[in-house]
Swiss-Prot record:
Biological process, per Gene Ontology: ribosomal small subunit assembly; translation
Cellular compartments per GO CC: cytosolic small ribosomal subunit
GO molecular function, one term: rRNA binding
Keyword Ribosomal protein in record: yes
Assigned keywords, A-Z: Ribonucleoprotein, Ribosomal protein, RNA-binding, rRNA-binding
Gene expressing this chain: rps19
Entry-linked InterPro entries: Ribosomal_uS19, Ribosomal_uS19_CS, Ribosomal_uS19_euk/arc, Ribosomal_uS19_SF
Phosphoprotein in keyword set: no
Source organism, top-level taxon: Archaea
The protein, known as: Small ribosomal subunit protein uS19
Chain's role: Protein S19 forms a complex with S13 that binds strongly to the 16S ribosomal RNA.
Lineage of origin: Archaea, Thermoproteota, Thermoprotei, Sulfolobales, Sulfolobaceae
Position of the signal peptide: none
């Protein structure tokens, strides 16, 4: 079972290349298309954790398990064309954040889609929290 490519993905272009061209392109040529930070990172090679994740990804693609979610802590893995269509759950320090990789994510890091901080929402200040609250009627 191969990945069914939705029509909107067929219109996608990354640096002038279609998704089909990217999937059939050798890794060396793909690396030349990436921005400098990602290009330099991939030229160094993959770390052991990244290599294990890539092997797992290739196994899932070979077996056609596109609906199964891949859980990982590897936030610094660059999204490659072969990852398009797969579901990932990336750890943000507290929980796993799930998302499906779409072509627009190619060249970004997995960690960019699993935000580690959330917006602080303060409640109402308590009694004596501010100087003006001394003059408010007592709650109760």
């Amino acid at each position: 079972m191969s990945l069914e490519i939705p029509p909107e993905w067929k219109k996608f272009r990354y640096r002038g290349k279609s998704l089909d061209e990217l999937l059939n392109m050798p890794m060396d040529e793909f690396i030349k298309l990436l921005p400098s930070r990602q290009r330099r990172s991939l030229k160094k090679g993959f770390s052991d954790k990244q290599r294990r994740l890539l092997e797992k990804i290739r196994k899932y693609v070979r077996e056609g398990k596109y609906s199964k979610t891949i859980k990982t802590h590897v936030r610094d893995m660059i999204i490659l064309p072969e990852m398009v269509g797969l579901k990932f759950a990336v750890y943000n320090g507290k929980e796993f954040v799930e998302f499906q990789v779409v072509p627009e994510m190619i060249g970004h890091y997995l960690g960019e889609f699993s935000i580690t901080t959330k917006k602080v929402e303060h409640g109402e200040p308590g009694l004596k929290a501010t100087r003006s609250s001394l003059f408010l009627a007592m709650k109760g």
